[in-house]
Amino acid sequence: MAKVAIVSDSTGCIPAETVKALDIYVNYISVVFGTESYREFIDMSPEEFLERSANYNGLPTTSQPSPGQTIALYESLFEQGYEDIIHINISSQLSGSHQTALTCAEMVNPEHIHVFDSRTVTYTQGMFAVYAAMKAKEGASAQEILEYLEMIRENNQFYAAINDLTNLRKGGRLSNVEAALGSLLQIKPICQIQPDGTFQAVEKIRTFKKALKRLIEISKETQLTEDYQLVVMHIGNEEAAKTVQTELQEIYPNHEINIYSISLVVAVHGGPGAVAVGWVKHK
């Protein structure tokens, strides 16, 4: 048994089979429609989220894990015999999950619970946990894994092409006028996670097809070596994600490029149809 338990917020979108194979523990964040709360990927699938969103007048909100839920998880891991816990969070700039985890760690065992701000989102965040869990299974200490995670945090990136501006408007990130003009002119923002973990529009492209091509160009310009894992992500747009995957595979034939769902928590802001690319350096 590994001495270090790896915990990921559910926003990491780690497939269930990977969670099981690597003994990763998941702390679930919820999406909220009115008074009804759903844990992402447990109580609500991406398909159900899109269907519910299409028939919902307002903007869904998100709910971070409760302190009670987080404390119970930590205590159960120590009861199982783990000596240390590393909890990898979605960017602290985008959710209160990181602060809640810090508070809970202080209450349970601050010396042996290490709360790590990934400063990123969705499966880019998930890869932090996947590679950390591999290190834990190899017998690495908590300090060794934390140093490894610092390296990943300095060498990762996430870009998303936003197809539908509705949620950006509902959430106040775009004015009604900006959203109307954007829709009329088919303006599609390219958003990037910044080094401090904020999510900002960095380019505006006319038509979604050209926005997807820009994602591919950015990935190509980066000239990723085989030390990097490259992935494609989407929310309800598998066809577009496969197109991006196919073109990236031609550029990077030695990389295994897989497709993952975007976190429902992120989809609340990014809206349906968004496609993203992300990469982390893992060795």
Residue locations for each model-derived region?
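Short, Lys/Arg-enriched, disordered terminal segments
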Residues: 1-3, 282-283
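Mixed-charge interfacial surface used for oligomerization/domain docking
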Residues: 11-36, 93, 97-114, 121-283
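Short beta-strand segments
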Residues: 7-8, 87-91, 117
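Short beta->alpha junction loops
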Residues: 64, 117-119
